Regions:
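N-terminal Rossmann-like dinucleotide-binding module
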Residues: 1-45
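Active-site loop of classical SDR/Rossmann-like NAD(P)-dependent oxidoreductases
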Residues: 11, 270-282
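Predominantly a Rossmann-like dinucleotide-binding segment in NAD(P)-dependent oxidoreductases
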Residues: 11, 121-202, 319
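Beta-loop-alpha module in the N-terminal Rossmann-like domain of NAD(P)-dependent dehydrogenases
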Residues: 35, 46-107
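Hydrophobic residues in well-ordered beta-strands that form the structural core
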Residues: 52, 90, 115-117, 222, ...
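Rossmann-fold dehydrogenase core element
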Residues: 103-120, 140-145
Length: 327
């Protein structure tokens, strides 16, 4: 199965390209990037062909594409790929605006193509085990969740609101919310959030706290801050403490690792030994395309998490709790 990558603007594209080239039933044959220098470099690195014209790439025999462009460009690239009837894996967030996300879902339905959104945390074995335990009632009725998705400040277009749609809240709320919706089979009722810029001299938020009430009454807190220093062993963390009436489960998605101490690199590094979540995401997408089944993570999942992000920004602006408007 031949696959193309549309843009390496997002750093996750590197992992997706790696796992495409390692997959026994897939090959990365085509790359487009608005940055020709970056595009040519990636094509050489992964033994692929660089296209300076996106239409030319989409006219090839690739069956599917992975879109890793700047957030604001997701809609245009999904529309174009769908028009050529290519199956689509789109980097998160699905879009920067709710109406754009809805239109992206619709255009993919109209053209009969898959729209999968890149939420790889679902593929972490420890997270999957926690989901099984929660749904089996091992901690009773869930009443609260305390979660973090901290990270290092990525810089570049991520801190340019016109390209990213926002800062750390846009970048990190969505991962936690996707896992919670999937794990608890619940939706958000209301949101209260406060954001600020505390760590860096940038024009988007890099710190904040989000408090949610789910339809079931579960209370959730999320810290989505870019608060990890450059010396942190990995890019960030994904942690959850799930409190139930009969017990508590704590999980760290990146806990399965060894530590590498190397003076030459100037920092401690985490060396993961568990299955990589990005590999799980790519494998699932390839299986969807080959079998024709619906993806594990749909465009609607992307829309639901984006709604929470937008409600959080609204709450921060109003300084009050906001009822979620589901589309």
């Amino acid at each position: 199965m031949k696959v193309g990558i549309i843009s390496f603007a997002h750093m996750h594209a590197l992992a997706y390209a790696k796992y495409l080239t390692e997959h026994p039933e897939a090959e990365l044959t085509a790359i487009w990037d608005a940055d020709s220098t970056r595009g040519n470099k990636m094509a050489e690195q992964f033994g692929s062909e660089y296209y300076s014209d996106l239409d030319e790439l989409l006219q090839t025999d690739v069956e599917a594409v992975i879109i890793c462009s700047e957030n604001v460009n997701h809609k245009a690239h999904v529309f174009k790929a769908a028009s050529y009837k290519k199956q689509i894996l789109c980097e998160k967030p699905i879009a920067t605006e709710i109406e754009d996300a809805k239109e992206m879902i619709q255009v993919c339905e109209d053209h009969g193509v898959i729209l999968q959104v890149a939420y790889p945390v679902r593929f972490v074995p420890a997270i999957q085990k926690v989901k099984d335990l929660v749904q089996a009632g091992k901690i009773g009725e869930v009443i609260a969740v305390n979660a973090t998705n901290h990270g290092q400040m990525p810089g570049g277009w991520f801190v340019e609101k016109e390209l990213s749609g926002g800062g750390s809240a846009t970048d990190h709320i969505v991962h936690i919310m996707d896992v919670l919706r999937w794990m608890l089979k619940d939706e958000v009722k209301n949101v209260y959030a406060e954001f600020d810029t505390r760590f860096y001299d940038i024009k988007v938020e890099d710190a904040g706290l989000v408090t949610l009430e789910l339809e079931s009454g579960v209370i959730v807190s999320i810290d989505p801050s870019w608060s990890r220093p450059k010396t942190f062993p990995t890019w960030g963390d994904v942690t959850m403490e799930i409190v139930g009436t009969e017990g508590t489960i704590a999980v760290d998605a990146y806990k399965q690792h060894s530590l590498l101490y190397n003076d030459a690199d100037g920092k401690i590094q985490q060396m993961p030994w568990a299955e990589d979540m990005d590999a799980g995401l790519v494998n699932d997408f390839i299986d969807c395309v080959k079998t024709g089944r619906q993806p594990f993570i749909t465009g609607t999942d992307g829309l639901r998490t984006l709604e929470v992000v937008k409600a959080a920004y609204e709450s921060d602006g109003l300084k009050e709790t906001v009822l979620l408007k589901r589309n």
